[in-house]
Amino acid sequence: MSQRIFLPDTLANWQWPRHLNPHYAEVKKASAAWAQSFRAFQTKAQEAFDRCDFNLLASFAYPLADEGDGCDLMNLFFVIDEYSDVSTEEEVRAQKDIVMDAIRNTEKPRPAGEWIGGEVARQFWDLAKKTASSQAQKRFIDTFDEYLESVVQQAADRNNSHIRGIESYLEVRRCTIGAKPSFALLEFDMQLPDEVINHPVIKELEKSCIDMLCLGNDVVSYNLEQARDDDGHNIVTIAMNELRTDVAGAMIWVDEYHKQLESRFMENFKKVPRWGGPIDLQVARYCDGLGNWVRANDQWSFESERYFGKKGPEIIQRRWITLMPKMVSEELGPQIVDGSHL
């Protein structure tokens, strides 16, 4: 008999509701066409990539945005993710160098025959930086570099079959999830000084938010990742290993830890200091954006076909799924999820 898994409803009491950007349809059309133009994947994998609808994630995460920068960034993230997941540490290091060179030198044409991720990154940042404040630009570049460095570390762990402990894993996962550069987009139209964005309360808010994103993503992605034999960088596997428990026990632990993070976030949300003037309005919008990101990530996970195929809307209600059989990939890139197995 197939093993059944219960997905904890970690956001049952989360105060931020589902909020979709009203421009979703038009920005999705433009960004999806842009992403497809690079031909980063073969036909079947590209279809699976399209079904993941990373534009939907961006439209949940940036519900007030007028531009499609968030959509383009999410598409860039997942191009990097799909390639790095099947690459060696040395290959991922080279990919990182290409992407950061492209971002730092958007006016420079990319060399013929170079990995396509460089041109995707160059085009994204060449357009996105035009609408970003100087502070937000710097923070994006710094945090994107940090994100890519952590992806190199993830590749090293994978190549060495290294399973980390919970704390060590979270240190790396806080970067591989890509939340910090995603948060930089929240402040593209803001003028937040370093002393504001680096205030201890703001930093704690970000940390709790990131940890909830990590746990939430790992819970919904575990089944697909174990089927692809790529679950070594997942809190469910990490908890099973450290706590010497099974999948059900790990899910219970994740649910309890998520509740602690939620309480910590709300406590700090109430402690956000005031600086006076328009800064306070920008800070309020930024912090609200953090809370919304948690909901956005969860909502997209079930409304797209990334993890559950067409069964997501049903699974978000019943929460029970069946452990998927092992999958063999025929092409580089995402695979279409057959929801009938869930």
UniProtKB/Swiss-Prot annotation:
The short sequence motif called DDXXD motif sits at: 81-85
Which Gene Ontology biological process is one annotated for this entry?
isoprenoid biosynthetic process
Which reactions is this enzyme annotated as catalysing?
(2E,6E)-farnesyl diphosphate = Delta(6)-protoilludene + diphosphate
**What does the entry list as the binding residues for (2E,6E)-farnesyl diphosphate?**
306-307
Q: Which UniProt keywords apply?
A: Lyase, Magnesium, Metal-binding, Virulence
Report the Pfam families cross-referenced here.
Answer: Terpene_syn_C_2
Q: Cross-referenced InterPro entries, in alphabetical order?
A: Isoprenoid_synthase_dom_sf, Terpene_cyclase-like_2
Q: How do people use this protein in biotech?
A: Melleolide sesquiterpene aryl esters are cytotoxic secondary products with anti-cancer potential. Armillaridin shows therapeutic and radiosensitizing effects on human esophageal cancer cells. Armillaridin induces autophagy-associated cell death in human chronic myelogenous leukemia as well as of hepatocellular carcinoma cells. Armillaridin can also inhibit the differentiation and activation of human macrophages and thus might have potential to be developed as a biological response modifier for inflammatory diseases.
Cofactor or coenzyme needed: Mg(2+)
User: Where Mg(2+) 3 is bound, by residue?
Assistant: 217, 221, 225
Q: Single GO molecular-function term?
A: metal ion binding
Q: What else is known?
A: Armillaria species are both devastating forest pathogens and some of the largest and oldest terrestrial organisms on Earth. They forage for hosts and achieve immense colony sizes via rhizomorphs, root-like multicellular structures of clonal dispersal. An A.ostoyae colony, known as the 'humongous fungus' in the Malheur National Forest in the Strawberry Mountains of eastern Oregon, was found to be the largest fungal colony in the world, spanning an area of 9.1 square kilometers. This organism is estimated to be some 8,000 years old and may weigh as much as 35,000 tons.
* Role description: Delta(6)-protoilludene synthase, part of the gene cluster that mediates the biosynthesis of melleolides, a range of antifungal and phytotoxic polyketide derivatives composed of an orsellinic acid (OA) moiety esterified to various sesquiterpene alcohols. The first step in melleolides biosynthesis is performed by the delta(6)-protoilludene synthase PRO1 which catalyzes the cyclization of farnesyl diphosphate to protoilludene. The orsellinic acid synthase armB produces OA by condensing acetyl-CoA with 3 malonyl-CoA units in a three-round chain elongation reaction folowed by a C2-C7 ring closure.
Give the protein name, as stated in the record. Delta(6)-protoilludene synthase
**Organism the protein comes from:** Armillaria ostoyae
